[in-house]
């Protein structure tokens, strides 16, 4: 029997026929405003509720802002951080400013994947993390797209080796058909694509599981909403593509 990690996101585990296979690295891919970050934070929060420690690697936002954004949905990670069950790896401030001086896990040069890897390893070992989010992995290779696949592989080797189930947030432009970076889709175990489409003058959210190693899954596109408690997916309302 394959061990699975429950996302805890309403509707998602049904679509994945029980959850994400343990140790999988899953790309959460989509354009701006599609809900990628909320999806990832909800995954971490639900893990904490199930007793699974988590790490959030912040590459695009100040760690203080990450926590504020989570609190909007009632996800207060401070108690878990104090208990050593949750940590934010600060790969945003570059070690500048008073916040960074207090921060335990800081990556000073995001162009140095080895430094990120070392900080990440230490954070995972010290918190005994089972879930990891990197938001966004695109930031690591935006200036050197040819390195995208190699960077994904390096991080995958480390995180899978440490027993973590991980979500890598990947940005794509609104019109882009791919998943954000050349070859990244081959370096991950799963891809969940989030979309925001204009239909009859109204924006509609939907997602589709493009691939997921180790499990069967729904092949349909499913509508979802962002509520005051986070993302809710409607697994029985699969539309037939766009």
From Swiss-Prot:
Domain KaiC spans what residues?
A: 3-242
Would the keyword Nucleotide-binding turn up in this protein's UniProt record?
yes
Give residues annotated as binding ATP.
30-37
Top-rank lineage group of the source organism: Bacteria
List the Gene Ontology MF annotations in alphabetical order: ATP binding
Alphabetical UniProt keywords: ATP-binding, Nucleotide-binding
Q: Does the keyword Plastid apply?
A: no
Query: What family is this?
Result: Belongs to the UPF0273 family.
Listed name of the protein = UPF0273 protein TM_0370
